[in-house]
Amino acid sequence: MSQFDVTVFTDGSCLGNPGPGGWAAIMRCNGCEKELSGGFALTTNNRMEILAVLEALEALRDPCKVTLFTDSQYVRNAVEKKWLAGWQRNGWKTADKKPVKNRDLWERLVPLLAKHSVSFRWVRGHSGHPENERCDVLARAQASRRGLPEDPGFTA
């Protein structure tokens, strides 16, 4: 069975850091497009950036070849520079022996990276990239909503 080629654009936003936050993803495959977004009452920008990637990859039922555009160097570097693999090897500790932040989200991401063939592409945020700008609008709209749920993994 051949893999579908999927293009994903993601962004996360936080109004204050920590503060209310939102995430968004635009997914394209075979001429179809889908927008996903959500948010939490109290979270961080990095959690929202990771969650945007997670939610997009979790939405893909079958293994896919994914080209993922993000403005988050944190997410991209964690995967491409093998920080994630190192954190796992070190019992979820950083190089200076501190607990890895956002471990709950990283642990959800690991099997998705094994399931899908994901290639990250960095885009400069707020530089006029149409899909990144659209994701930013969606993420900010989510962060601005009233009655957002609590982020179960956020710790101050």
Swiss-Prot record:
* Binding annotation for Mg(2+) 1: D11, E49, D71
Species assigned in the record: Nitratidesulfovibrio vulgaris (strain ATCC 29579 / DSM 644 / CCUG 34227 / NCIMB 8303 / VKM B-1760 / Hildenborough) (Desulfovibrio vulgaris)
Biological process, per Gene Ontology:
DNA replication, removal of RNA primer
Localisation per UniProt entry:
Cytoplasm
Give the function comment from the record.
Endonuclease that specifically degrades the RNA of RNA-DNA hybrids.
What name does UniProt use for this protein? Answer: Ribonuclease H
Where does this chain mainly localize? cytoplasm
Q: How is the cofactor bound?
A: Binds 1 Mg(2+) ion per subunit. May bind a second metal ion at a regulatory site, or after substrate binding.
Co-factor(s):
Mg(2+)
Q: Which UniProt keywords apply?
A: Cytoplasm, Endonuclease, Hydrolase, Magnesium, Metal-binding, Nuclease
Any one Gene Ontology MF annotation carried by this entry is:
magnesium ion binding
